[in-house]
C-alpha cells in the first residue's frame, strides 16, 4: 500500500510546516483527486495551520471554498421550496447526508461539496411526492424502461429527479439499503426519532434530519456498501469529523452507536467505521469502541480481504498512489459492491440485460460511425475509382 501525502497530512497536519513547493503541489493534486481541497482547508484551520499555507495554494483552496459556499446557498433555497411542497402534502421528509449536515450546521458541512439533495420518505408517500415534483418542473434522469424497473423493484430509491430549469438533482429514498438486500433495514428504527430543525433563519418551514447516532451509522453503511470508492477517503473523513463532533456533544455516543447498530443489525458497518478510522487515519477510539472492535473482529468474515480492499482504496485516487494492490482492490470492491446490492440470482440477469442493451445501442450507432469513417478515408475513394 502506498501511503498518500494527503493521508499523512490528515493524520498529522503539522508536517506541512516542512513542505517545499513540490510537496504542496502534490498535496493539492491529491486533494483535488479525492474531492477534498476545501476539506483540507477545514483540517488546516482546525489545527491552526492555515497561516503556514503558501499564498498560491491558499488562493486555490479559497476558490474551492467559494464554490462550496455558493452551492450551500443554492441548497438552502431548494430546501425552502421543497419544504413548502412537503408542508402542502402533509409529509415529513428527512434530509440525509450532505444536505443534512448543512441544515444541522455541523462542522462537517464546512468545505463539503455534494452533488444532490438526498431525502428519506415513507414508501407509501413516494408516488404522491413524485407527481407533485413533476408538476413543479422535476423529471426523472432515467428514461430507460430497464433502469426504471431496476430502481423501483430492487433499489432503496426511485430514479434521481432533476429540475429542468435549475439542474438541481434530488435522490428520493425509502430505505438506506436496496430492498432486495438480504439484510434489509427497518427504516422506522432510524426515522422515528428524527430531529426537527426549526431555527434556520432562511426557512419558513422546519426541516428534519436523523439523530446523531443514526446519521453516523447511515454514513458508515453507505460508505461500506459502496463498490466504487473514488471518494472513499472523503467518506472516511466525514465519519472522522462526525465522530469528533458527536463525541463532544452527545452523552455516551459510543454506546448510542452500538445500541442502534444492534437494533438495525448493522454491527458490521459500525465495526468497519471504527476499524478503518483507526487503521487509516490513526484516530484514537474510545474505550467502549476499542472493546467493541476487539470483540467483533473475532467473528468478522473475510477480514483479511476486507482489510486489503479498504486499506488500499482509502487514499487519494491519483497516479502517485497507483499500484497493483490498488488495482486488485478496486476490482474486488466493485464486485463486492454489486453482490451487497443484489443477490446473484438477481445480479446476473441484471448485468446480462444491461450488457445486451449497451451492445444493442452500440450496434445502432455503428453503421453511422462506419459511414463517417469511410467518407473521411481517402482509401475508400481510391477503391471506388478503381
Label the model's feature ranges.
Residues 1-115, 121-386:
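Conserved NTP-donor binding/palm subdomain of two-metal-ion nucleotidyltransferases/polymerases, i.e.
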